[in-house]
Swiss-Prot record:
It comes from Geobacter metallireducens (strain ATCC 53774 / DSM 7210 / GS-15). Catalyzes the conversion of dethiobiotin (DTB) to biotin by the insertion of a sulfur atom into dethiobiotin via a radical-based mechanism. Binds 1 [4Fe-4S] cluster. The cluster is coordinated with 3 cysteines and an exchangeable S-adenosyl-L-methionine. The gene is bioB. Pathway: Cofactor biosynthesis; biotin biosynthesis; biotin from 7,8-diaminononanoate: step 2/2. It catalyses: (4R,5S)-dethiobiotin + (sulfur carrier)-SH + 2 reduced [2Fe-2S]-[ferredoxin] + 2 S-adenosyl-L-methionine = (sulfur carrier)-H + biotin + 2 5'-deoxyadenosine + 2 L-methionine + 2 oxidized [2Fe-2S]-[ferredoxin]. This is Biotin synthase. Homodimer. Belongs to the radical SAM superfamily. Biotin synthase family. It holds the Pfam family Radical_SAM. Signal peptide: none annotated. Its EC number is 2.8.1.6.
Length: 329
C-alpha cells in the first residue's frame, strides 16, 4: 500500500477523523494511488465492520405523481417518463413482497413511497399494519422511506415495529438548489434528526453523477458524519429519459469506486451500501465495491428500474468468499 495511505488508514483506525482538505485531495487519486485508496478503505472497513456483506431489498409501494422536482427522479410530476403511477399498494402486497425479499436473501426490507410525505390516517395506518404482520411472519427487518415526517409519525412507525428510517439528502447542501427547488435542504436534515430522536436507526445517503463537484461529494459525507447516521446508501445516476438529467453521462467505474472509498474513510464505522445505478455505472467492476469499502448492496429491483437477478449477486458473493450478514443487525 502507498505509505501515506497506509499511515492514513492507521490514523483512522486509531480514531482520527479525515479532514475536508485531506478528503478533497484524496478524491483526485489516480493510477496506482487510486488502488492504494481502495486498499486503505478496505482495511478500515474490515477493521470496523468485519468481512461480512449486508443485503437489502425495497418495494416501490406508491409510485409517481410526486410534487417535488428532483432533477434525477422519474417519479416527479414535473417530468414526463414511463415510470408507473399507482396509489399505495394494499397490505397483503406489502407483506408478500417482504416474504419474497426474505426468500431472496435480504435481511432488510424497505417500504418506499413517492411524494413529499405520507398521509396520516389510512396510508400510514396501512403501512403500520403491514409492518406488524411482517414482524410476526418473517425475520426480515422492516424499514420505511416515506418522505419528510414529523416526530409523531416517527414514533408511530417505531411503535409499529419499524427499525430503520431511510431518508436521503441526495447531494450536498451547496448543490441541492440545482437539483430540487420545491423544498428546502433543511427539511430533509430535520427529518433525519426527528427520526433519530424517535429512536429509529437512520439510513441516509445520496446520489452521484448529478453534476456535483468532488468537493461537494465530500461536503455531503461531512454532513452525514455530523448527523451521525447509521447506514449510508450510495447511488449513482442512471439517467432516465424525460427527466432533467436525461442527457447526463454515467460516472466511470473507477470514479464510483473512489467515491465509495472516500465515504468509507470519512465514515469509517458506518454501514455503506451501493444501491441504484450499480449495474450501469460499475459494469464489470461491480464486485470491486467490497474492496473499496462498501459493506453492503441492494439486491432485486430499484424504484422504477430493474436490477439484475438476485442469484447473480449471490454468485458474486460466493466467488468473493464473502459472508452475508444483516443490514439492520
Amino acid at each position: 500500500m502507498n505509505k501515506s495511505l497506509e499511515t492514513l488508514a492507521g490514523r483512522i483506525i486509531a480514531g482520527e477523523q479525515l479532514s475536508v482538505e485531506e478528503s478533497i485531495a484524496l478524491s483526485a487519486s489516480s493510477g496506482t494511488d487510486a488502488f492504494a485508496l481502495f486498499l486503505a478503505a478496505s482495511r478500515v472497513k474490515e477493521h470496523f465492520l468485519g468481512n461480512g456483506v449486508d443485503l437489502c431489498s425495497i418495494i416501490n409501494a406508491k409510485s409517481g405523481r410526486c410534487p417535488e422536482n428532483c432533477a434525477f427522479c422519474a417519479q416527479s410530476a414535473h417530468h414526463t417518463t414511463n415510470a408507473p403511477i399507482y396509489p399505495l399498494v394494499d397490505e397483503d402486497k406489502l407483506v408478500a413482497c417482504a416474504k419474497e425479499a426474505e426468500a431472496a436473501g435480504s435481511r432488510c426490507y424497505g417500504i418506499i413511497t413517492s411524494g413529499t410525505t405520507i398521509k396520516k390516517g389510512e396510508e400510514l395506518d396501512r403501512i403500520c399494519r403491514a409492518v406488524r404482520r411482517i414482524r410476526e411472519t418473517t425475520s426480515i427487518a422492516p424499514s420505511c422511506s416515506l418522505g419528510i415526517i414529523d416526530h409523531e409519525t416517527a414514533v408511530t412507525l417505531r411503535e409499529a415495529g419499524v427499525e430503520t428510517y431511510h431518508h436521503n439528502l441526495e447531494t450536498s447542501r451547496s448543490f441541492f438548489p440545482h437539483i430540487c427547488t420545491t423544498h428546502d435542504y433543511e427539511e430533509d436534515v430535520e427529518t433525519v434528526r426527528v427520526a433519530k430522536q424517535a429512536g429509529l436507526t437512520i439510513c441516509c445517503g445520496g446520489i452521484f453523477g448529478l453534476g456535483e463537484t468532488a468537493a461537494q461529494r465530500v461536503e455531503l459525507a461531512m454532513t452525514l458524519r455530523e448527523l451521525d447516521v447509521d447506514s449510508v446508501p450510495l447511488n449513482f445516476l442512471n439517467p432516465i429519459e424525460g427527466t432533467r438529467l436525461a442527457g447526463s453521462k454515467l460516472i466511470s467505474p473507477l470514479e464510483c469506486l473512489k467515491t465509495i472509498a472516500l465515504f468509507r474513510l470519512i465514515l469509517p464505522t458506518k454501514k455503506i451500501a451501493v444501491c441504484g445505478g450499480r449495474e450501469q455505472n460499475l459494469r464489470d467492476l461491480q464486485s470491486w465495491i467490497f474492496f473499496a469499502g462498501a459493506s453492503g448492496t441492494m439486491i432485486g429491483n430499484y424504484l422504477t428500474t430493474t436490477g439484475r437477478p438476485a442469484e447473480q449477486d449471490w454468485q458474486m458473493l460466493r466467488d468473493l468468499e464473502l459472508a452475508v450478514g444483516g443490514c439492520c443487525e
